[in-house]
């Protein structure tokens, strides 16, 4: 509706003994539902959505850490950490004030 796109290059993921674990959770539909990860009771998941104003291609900057939008347009990320429960999910992320970086 507003022209923003979700990037395919970064994903949400499971969180456990390691920060980044399976399942990888895509920001966009990439195949049939039968091929999407199965979410299980007790799993903790980081749901990360990166929106971009222009082309969603990303680049890794020379510092080896910073990721930018290749065409230089604006981008934003929203992330929530949730735990799958018997009743659905519990949001574990602590609310904070928005910070423009």
Task: Label each region the model flagged.
Residues 1-27, 34-37, 43-56:
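Conserved, well-structured core segments that form or line functional sites
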